[in-house]
Regions:
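Phosphate-/nucleic-acid-contacting segments
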Residues: 121-189
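Cyclic-nucleotide recognition modules
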Residues: 32-91, 95
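Structural motif
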Residues: 17, 61-63, 171
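Polybasic "coupling" helices that flank or enter modular domains
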Residues: 77, 81-148
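Regulatory nucleotide-sensing modules
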Residues: 1-15
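Short alpha-helix-to-loop micro-motif enriched in aromatics/charged/Gly
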Residues: 25-32
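A residue-level structural signature of the nucleotidyltransferase/glycosyltransferase Rossmann-like core
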Residues: 10, 32, 64-65, 133, ...
Length: 189
């Protein structure tokens, strides 16, 4: 779906990954959310009769399950436990947006990137919990924070120089990580 389209379905990613982005008049993208297998996207207009707030773009070949809006709302009414779990998910995403806006307001790229990495580590998102590898590209971090890729690269180099992250073989790792030692991480070799 595209930003501005009318919502007719609940969407859940069965397999793959989807970027949920806004594009400005210059064609620059702002990454609102990177959804992976098992996650839903585009939920807002299911509840407020508005249009999609952002566009969904598959990152890799992706299978998405769609449930008509009326059936989804009926499901929530009939199963309060699902409704509460779904509400908790929306609150978690809203809390992340508040966090990110606060950090962006600091205007310090190094601090914005470090805070984002720490948040992702704390919430076990886009960080390999075995080896500490940051599973977002520098471009994705730039799109999430509204910074230029070059600014993110500089900030990450500074964080590496300060020992707050490690950059090994062009991959970034959380503080205290020694990198992905071959044969030790089930996810990365």
């Amino acid at each position: 779906f595209k930003e501005g389209d009318r919502c007719q379905y609940y969407h859940q990613i069965a397999q793959g990954a989807v970027r949920w982005v806004n594009t400005n008049h210059d064609g620059e993208e702002y990454l609102q959310y990177l959804a992976e297998s098992g996650e839903s996207i585009g939920e807002f207009p299911l509840f407020d009769e508005g249009v999609y707030a952002a566009s969904a773009i598959a990152v890799v070949p992706t299978t998405v399950w769609r449930l008509p809006k009326s059936r989804f709302l009926h499901l929530l009414r009939e199963h309060p436990d699902i409704h509460f779990a779904f509400s908790a998910l929306l609150v978690k995403r809203l809390r992340f947006k508040f966090f990110l806006m606060k950090e962006i307001a600091s205007h310090e790229p190094r601090q914005i990137v470090l805070s984002l990495i720490n948040y992702l580590k704390r919430t076990s998102q886009h960080i390999c919990m075995e080896c500490g590898q940051i599973l977002l590209t520098r471009r994705q971090i730039a799109e999430m924070t509204g910074m230029r890729v070059e600014t993110v690269i500089r900030a990450m180099r500074q964080l590496n120089d300060q020992g707050l992250i490690a950059i090994l073989d062009r991959k970034a790792y959380c503080e205290g990580s020694k990198g992905c030692v071959p044969g030790t991480c089930k996810t990365h070799g």
